[in-house]
Amino acid sequence: IHCPEDNKECGVISINDGQLIDEILDCGEIKNKSNINIKIKDSANAHVNSINIVEGELVDELIDCLSIADSSVEIKISSSVSTSANTISITEGELLDETMDVKNHIRNSKIDATITNSANAFYSATMTITGGELIDEIIDTNEITNSKIEIKLTTSGCASYIGNNAGHTFTLTNGELIDEIIDCSNNISDNNPISITVENSANVITQNSSNHVPVLNITNSQLLDELVDCPNIN
């Protein structure tokens, strides 16, 4: 979605319990040496005057399945799932949520997820996140057993000011820029090699030629929280 820069009245977008991209792969089981390769490039971006997301996302659940066993999954997201606007509001929503939603388990498998220059928010007046995130749950599952997991985030999940307004504000309440890269509700077991790399991400950036001081309001929130959320790792 693109609004021409010379048309300031163009582009007021509201996403309520919806997405731009949802469930590229929606299935039961991924098994028997399956090889899944998903690449998202220059997609699901919104360059508009104002964007309001309520209980929705730009991208949600690229993979939605019951289980993954004896298989390989590779996901690459680049220059996607970002927004630039005068005002940005996210309430109980995300730009990128549950890249992989695996209801039951991941077993004897290899998962490789790379996110580059994506899920970024560029604002020129105000940005507000309430109970939401820019990136949440790259992997959401119940159990990970005997699997190799590699996740790399580079220049992603950032909030960047790009205007010249004296009164610009960034407000983060009960939310995060990046939260729960792996959310495993039961256990991670059998010596799983898990590698998570975060580079130049989850930053609040002010680029202001007029030297206006931004107003930053961060309440009960974090920029980066819970790389792995799991009750048992053994």
How should these model regions be labeled?
Residues 1-234:
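Low-complexity repeat regions of mature extracellularly deployed or surface/particle-associated proteins
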